[in-house]
Amino acid sequence: MLEFKYDTQLLIEGENLDEDEISEYFTENFQGDCLLAVGDEELIKIHFHTNAPWEVLEYCASLGDIHDIVIENMERQANGLQG
């Protein structure tokens, strides 16, 4: 069984976005792993494994418009099912 079940990916579109601040917030406030927060001041790509993807979405939506959201159940994928 995986420690963190959901592969959560999305884009944040906004103004004055800071990938370092976003990464720090994730590290301090969310349980998970495989964090990737890359981009520029107007667009950040997020990739994160967590058991609470709704918390990630809520935080990211507070920073700007979120889109291209993908949440995959990696446990199902590991069992040969659609995630």
Task: Place the predicted regions along the sequence by residue.
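N-terminal loops that bind phosphate or other acidic moieties
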Residues: M1-G83
